[in-house]
Every structure is written in C-alpha cells, then in structure tokens.
Amino acid sequence: MEQNTDNVFNFSAGPAALPKAVMQQAQQELIDWQGLGTSVMEISHRSKEFIKVAQEAEQDLRDLLNIPDNYKVLFCQGGARAQFAAVPLNLLGDAETATYIDGGYWAESAVEEAKKYCEPDVFDAKTEIDGKVAVLPASEWKIAPEAAYVHFCPNETIDGIEINDLPITDKPIVADMSSTILSREIDVSKYGVIYAGAQKNIGPSGIAIAIVRDDLLGMAKQVLPSILDYKVLAEKESMFNTPPTFAWYLSGLVFKWLKAQGGVKSIETVNREKAKLLYDYIDQSDFYRNGVHPSNRSLMNVPFQLAKPELDATFLELADAKGLKALKGHRVVGGMRASIYNAMPLEGVQALVDFMKEFEQNYA
C-alpha cells in the first residue's frame, strides 16, 4: 500500500532526508534533463552542460559559506572516511605528529586512520558537567608544539555532542563537518581544511566536499594516491577521474534550495527552533532523557532514552506507523536518535514531540 509521503518524516542520521522540493525536481528531470533527451546521469562529466552544473554548485557553496578566494573547493569521492587518510597524507609534510581532539566516536575513527601515517597526539576533551556528557572548552585543549595541524569533529552524530568554539593556535585547524556543515554560520577563514561527507546536509552519499586553504596545497611529502591529493584535485577541478555526477548534480540542487530558504543564516534560525522544541520537551519530561549537557548539545542529532528501555521496540514500531521514520539510536549507544538536519521541517519535529507526548501518556 502506498503511504502518503506528506505525513512521513525521515529522521535518519545518514543517508539523510533530502529537501522534498529537490527530490521532486530531480524526479521531473530524471529522464529528460534540460531537453537533452537523456538523464544527467548519462552525459559526459566533461560536457559543457555538466561543467555548468559543477561550476554553479561550487559558486553556490562559496556564496552560502562565504568561502574566501584563497580556498579551493573540492568535490571528492570516498566520503569522510577517505578524508581521514587524505588529511594526514596531504598536511603532515615533514612533521611526525598532529593533534587530534577526541570528542567522540568519529573523532576517534579519524585517529585510528591517522595512526597509519603518523603518531597522533590525542587530547581527550570529553568531560562531565552535572552528570551529563560535555566537552572541555577549546581554550583548555592541549596542542602539541610540533603538531602539523589540529583536527576535530564539531558534531558527533552518535552521542549528539557539538563543539561550538575553536582554539587559538597558529596550527591549521582541520574540521570534519560531515554532520554540521551548512547548518549554522561559520567563519571559513579560521580553518585550514574543512571536509564533509555529503549524505547529511549536502546531498546523497557518494561524494564529499573538501575546502582547502591554498597554502596547504602541495605539502604532501609521502607517496599518496593521486585521487586523494588535494593539489591534483584542485588542478583538475575535481575531475581527475570520473566524478559521481548524479550526486554532484543533486548537491547543487540542495545548494540552490538552501539559497532559496534565505541561506545559512536563515536555516540556522530554523534549526535552533527545531532543536529547542525537542530538547525542551525532553527536559521537562521524567519519561525521556538526553545525556548531553546543554552547553554541548547538538543542533543536528538528538539522542534520547526512555525511562523504560524495554519499551524501545514498541516506541519505534508505533512511531514508524505514524510516519516517523529511522528513530533507532546508533548501535553503540542504543535508545533513540532524531537527526534533524536542514531538510527536516519544523512540522516534522512538532509531529515527533506530539507522538512522544502521546506515548508518554500511554506508557509512563
């Protein structure tokens, strides 16, 4: 039986929901794109039609993030995990270490990959405040004097932890923004490298973005695959090999959609409203709990637990029947998780809160 998609809200952590308007446009254009009689998936990545798609996508992203001219925007393959290797291979130079700030699972995953190429200097920034998980302020991070760069993950999707400040350092700051890019305003000029897997706030899986400051290009001293070499990708305009053209095209549509919403500043206002609505309800309830201190709560990923964990399966089943999809928490932490990326409308979060109220009344 076909479900009314107007009443379905997808809370998946990634691949995540795409804006409905983007999906509808892609659907309309799928078979006959721009009157060519073919799909955008079927044309050459070096055709003038696709070159225009690529150039517009880059310019729109530059506009949205106010990216300075001395940064390259690279459309990469391999997702953020490929960047876990690309970062040390491109940035270490003659150095033997880099400082990695450990704020959670994904930061730790980056460390494990970096160990293949250097001896990471790991600073554990995790702490507790009033019995809740938190992260030490950046002013307290210890950065090795000999570090080639400082790497951190501003948003941990699994734990629902967000880091909102930056250290004062002369080292290049590298940020894995896979789950937070385009969700709030940032000053790109404070970073050396920003990278992000696409499948949360950019587009479908299969592509990643790397924003690299010009002076960090060409530093690689180690042998590294050309496909991961920032300098090669910059020189070839992200077309060293055949790129994932459909993912690139869809990402471009998302950028245009976001500009139509008023840009990052406007979407940040909506994102803060969505997060406040959900956190406020959880905090006033004795039936639901979020274990992250308010100072480090994620705007994008809201994990929560039931007072009666034995009801988890029932909660998920009934939520799914209401059109509230993909609320199961990550296997590492269990419970529930609502991922409320840019494409999630306020109405979706309100529908979730209404369901949570109803469930609490029936099962508390």
Swiss-Prot record:
Pathway: Amino-acid biosynthesis; L-serine biosynthesis; L-serine from 3-phospho-D-glycerate: step 2/3; Cofactor biosynthesis; pyridoxine 5'-phosphate biosynthesis; pyridoxine 5'-phosphate from D-erythrose 4-phosphate: step 3/5
Amino-acid biosynthesis is among the record's keywords: yes
Cofactor: pyridoxal 5'-phosphate
Keywords attached to this entry: Amino-acid biosynthesis, Aminotransferase, Cytoplasm, Pyridoxal phosphate, Pyridoxine biosynthesis, Serine biosynthesis, Transferase
CDD domains recorded: PSAT_like
N6-(pyridoxal phosphate)lysine: residues bearing it: K200
Cofactor info, note text: Binds 1 pyridoxal phosphate per subunit.
Domain of life, per lineage: Bacteria
Binding site for pyridoxal 5'-phosphate: A80, R81, W106, T157, D176, Q199, N241, T242
One GO cellular component, as annotated: cytoplasm
HAMAP family (UniProt xref): SerC_aminotrans_5 (MF_00160)
The name this protein goes by in its record: Phosphoserine aminotransferase
Organism (species): Vibrio parahaemolyticus serotype O3:K6 (strain RIMD 2210633)
Lineage: Bacteria, Pseudomonadati, Pseudomonadota, Gammaproteobacteria, Vibrionales
Gene name of the record: serC
